[in-house]
Amino acid sequence: MGMAAESQFHVLAVDDSLFDRKLIERLLQKSSCQVTTVDSGSKALEFLGLRQSTDSNDPNAFSKAPVNHQVVEVNLIITDYCMPGMTGYDLLKKVKESSAFRDIPVVIMSSENVPARISRCLEEGAEEFFLKPVRLADLNKLKPHMMKTKLKNQKLEEIETTSKVENGVPTAVADPEIKDSTNIEIEILPLQQDLLLVQQEEQTLSINNKRKSVEEGISTDRARPRFDGIATAV
């Protein structure tokens, strides 16, 4: 399995071919996606938190995993159509039948261009149907889903922030006023020092300007034709 940072758009890639898994993983990582790869539909359902039911004779019957099972959020599933055991179409149906995962976009891949197969998958709820080998241009079609997820996460963060503000600061935060005043004090001290420096510079500049004005006045007086005045007096 290939994993990356949790903050990225998370894609679950399902394919029984190691070559195709590596290819799709590299292409998705070029789009800054987090990628998890599995080699079968049953492993994909297990990763999502679904497991095969032991209480049923149906080999395709799946139930929810135990509560303590750690479920990683998946933003999109891309799966091969032809796989042994569980096909991509079967996986698509299982995902869409699940109340917890039906909103996850599912993309089907296949090396065979069969119109009836494509129509069946799209009617079942697949977002896209890509022909193999999948290219980067194909994955660019997934960008709207990435943007939708990003906006959804931003909205959830805003709701969470608003909820915290409405409910007040948790009691776990000790003496917020003292903490805030300390921070303000720390921030004000450098500011006061800067203001003092500015005032000192202004005073120095003012003294220099006055001195310059006096010197210019003296030099002007010195430049007057005193000898001419004496000569006239004579």
UniProtKB/Swiss-Prot annotation:
InterPro entries: ARR-like, CheY-like_superfamily, Sig_transdc_resp-reg_receiver. Gene3D superfamilies: 3.40.50.2300. Signal peptide: none annotated. Predominantly expressed in roots. GO terms for molecular function: phosphorelay response regulator activity. Two-component system major event consists of a His-to-Asp phosphorelay between a sensor histidine kinase (HK) and a response regulator (RR). In plants, the His-to-Asp phosphorelay involves an additional intermediate named Histidine-containing phosphotransfer protein (HPt). This multistep phosphorelay consists of a His-Asp-His-Asp sequential transfer of a phosphate group between first a His and an Asp of the HK protein, followed by the transfer to a conserved His of the HPt protein and finally the transfer to an Asp in the receiver domain of the RR protein. It holds the Pfam family Response_reg. Belongs to the ARR family. Type-A subfamily. Interacts with AHP1 and AHP3. This is Two-component response regulator ARR9. It comes from Arabidopsis thaliana (Mouse-ear cress).
